[in-house]
Design a protein with these regions (language model features):
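Short catalytic/ligand-binding loop motif for oxyanion handling, primarily in non-cytosolic enzymes
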Residues: 17-20, 78-84, 138-141
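Conserved short histidine dyad/triad with adjacent acidic residue
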Residues: 73-91
Length: 156
């Protein structure tokens, strides 16, 4: 991927336990539609990145019906926070695909049970993929002078 050709839009994650807001730059490939419906295409880069997901699913024999949302998330080091707020991407059953698109230190993805106890912590590495059943999750921030880029696809 070439970030110089991929427009990123500034936004915030929701607040975490301390009420602080974590900045994030996002390229929205597919926007969320109605509950459980395929999302709306939003980017000229949609097919390029969603084909990564589709190829992975084909090779691993993973079936899916439709893509709900897809995005490229770009975050940097945040000295006042260690991770983003704990959240679930949708309020209905779904699955999640996350692929790290670069190497960096820190910035793990954490998955939680319903009591917000960590049940899994990823080790980020370029092109590593995490598939989940839509569990609660959060992300850590990368080390100073680094950035974290991830492709996220939610689907059913």
């Amino acid at each position: 991927y070439q970030t110089q050709k991929l427009p990123l839009f500034f936004g915030y994650t929701n607040t975490n336990d301390n009420g602080k807001i974590g900045p994030v730059f996002t390229h929205y490939l597919r926007l969320t539609s109605e509950v459980d419906s395929e999302g709306f295409p939003n980017s000229d880069h949609l097919y390029e990145f969603e084909n990564i997901f589709k190829t992975f699913c084909y090779r691993k024999k993973i079936t899916y019906n439709r893509i709900l949302r897809s995005a490229i998330n770009f975050t940097t080091h945040q000295p006042d926070d260690t991770k983003t707020y704990i959240h679930c991407d949708h309020d209905f059953p779904h699955k999640q695909f996350l692929m790290y698109l670069n190497n960096f230190d820190g910035g793990s993805t954490f998955f939680y049970d319903n009591n917000e106890k960590v049940i899994y912590k990823s080790t980020p590495m370029k092109y590593n993929v995490i598939m989940s059943d839509g569990e609660l999750h959060s992300q850590g921030y990368c080390a100073p002078q680094q950035y974290r880029v991830a492709l996220v696809v939610t689907y059913v």
